[in-house]
């Protein structure tokens, strides 16, 4: 696990330097290089983005981590922590997206997951063994809504901002495909899978510190069943960010899990 973590977390300065060198090389190769046009999401994000200095980023990261540890229900602090600590991991995720056709389509389309963009009435008509039907059932059983995710504000690059947005909006879809509820045990288990799958520091933090808050009975179940299952799935599962979930509604959920390398925990 440590090797995977180290592999994912390349120094941010080095990554920025490599990208800058590539950009300079491309500029030399063409006399009049044209900037890549911004799409609707990127234009809107740049209007609403809050620019912060490196010191402010460090201060926000430290403050939000303490606040999130003291009160895990402070979703605003958890969101801030993700943005101020996750940039390097997001660059790695962007590379992963660009390495697959499905990921490239996501970055081109930039789909959003809201009640205004998903036809939930249609999903309710799907057979019960489809991914779409399972997603609707998950939302109803756990009384959650896809409209509750906080907007990204502190990332500099709009593409990274979309990836963080995508991660947040797909969180319930990950719960669905993993067959995990939104209780503390389920959240901690999902955070481990997400941490190993994405490399996002906030996921590691949520997994480690979330487990500390488990009650004794929950902790026994966590150590005996949930943690081994989560670590195994996190290491084995294919990258989840490049999955175009909205194109998979009609897919049999068991086939989808098999394709992604996911096994469901037997909670009996």
From Swiss-Prot:
Topology versus the membrane: Peripheral membrane protein
Pfam families assigned: Coq4 (PF05019)
EC number: 4.1.1.130
InterPro entries from the UniProt entry: Coq4, Coq4_euk
Gene Ontology MF terms: 4-hydroxy-3-methoxy-5-polyprenylbenzoate decarboxylase activity
Alphabetized UniProt keyword annotations: Lyase, Membrane, Metal-binding, Mitochondrion, Mitochondrion inner membrane, Ubiquinone biosynthesis, Zinc
Binding site for Zn(2+): 171-172, 175, 187
Keyword Repeat assigned: no
Top EC class, one word: lyase
Essential cofactor(s): Zn(2+)
Catalytic activities: a 4-hydroxy-3-methoxy-5-(all-trans-polyprenyl)benzoate + H(+) = a 2-methoxy-6-(all-trans-polyprenyl)phenol + CO2
GO cellular component, one term: ubiquinone biosynthesis complex
Pathway stated in the Swiss-Prot or TrEMBL entry: Cofactor biosynthesis; ubiquinone biosynthesis
Compartment annotation: Mitochondrion inner membrane
Record's miscellaneous remark: This protein may be expected to contain an N-terminal transit peptide but none has been predicted.
Subunit structure: Component of a multi-subunit COQ enzyme complex.
Family, as annotated: Belongs to the COQ4 family.
Alphabetized HAMAP family for the sequence: Coq4
Official protein name in the record: Ubiquinone biosynthesis protein COQ4 homolog, mitochondrial
Protein's gene: Coq4
């Amino acid at each position: 696990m440590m090797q995977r973590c180290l592999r994912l977390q390349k120094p941010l300065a080095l990554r920025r330097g490599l990208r800058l060198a590539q950009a300079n090389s491309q500029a030399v190769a063409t006399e009049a290089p044209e900037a890549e046009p911004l799409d609707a999401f990127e234009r809107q994000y740049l209007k609403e983005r809050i620019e912060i200095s490196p010191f402010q980023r460090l201060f926000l990261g430290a403050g939000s981590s303490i606040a999130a540890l003291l009160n895990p229900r402070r979703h605003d602090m958890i969101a801030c922590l993700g943005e101020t600590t996750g940039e390097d991991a997001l660059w790695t995720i962007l590379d992963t997206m660009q390495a697959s056709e499905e990921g490239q389509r996501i970055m081109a389309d930039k789909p959003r997951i809201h009640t205004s963009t998903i036809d939930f009435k249609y999903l309710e008509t799907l057979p019960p063994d489809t991914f779409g039907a399972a997603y609707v059932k998950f939302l109803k059983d756990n009384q959650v809504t896809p409209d509750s995710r906080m907007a990204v504000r502190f990332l500099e690059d709009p593409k990274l901002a979309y990836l963080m947005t995508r991660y947040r909006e797909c969180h319930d879809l990950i719960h669905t495909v993993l067959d995990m509820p939104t209780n503390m045990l389920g959240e901690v288990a999902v955070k481990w899978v997400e941490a190993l799958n994405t490399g996002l520091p906030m996921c590691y933090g949520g997994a480690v510190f979330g487990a500390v808050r488990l009650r004794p009975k929950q902790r026994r179940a966590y150590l005996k069943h949930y943690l081994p299952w989560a670590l195994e799935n996190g290491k084995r599962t294919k990258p989840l960010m490049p999955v175009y979930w909205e194109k998979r509604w009609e897919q049999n959920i068991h086939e989808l899990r098999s394709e992604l390398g996911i096994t469901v925990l037997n909670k009996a």
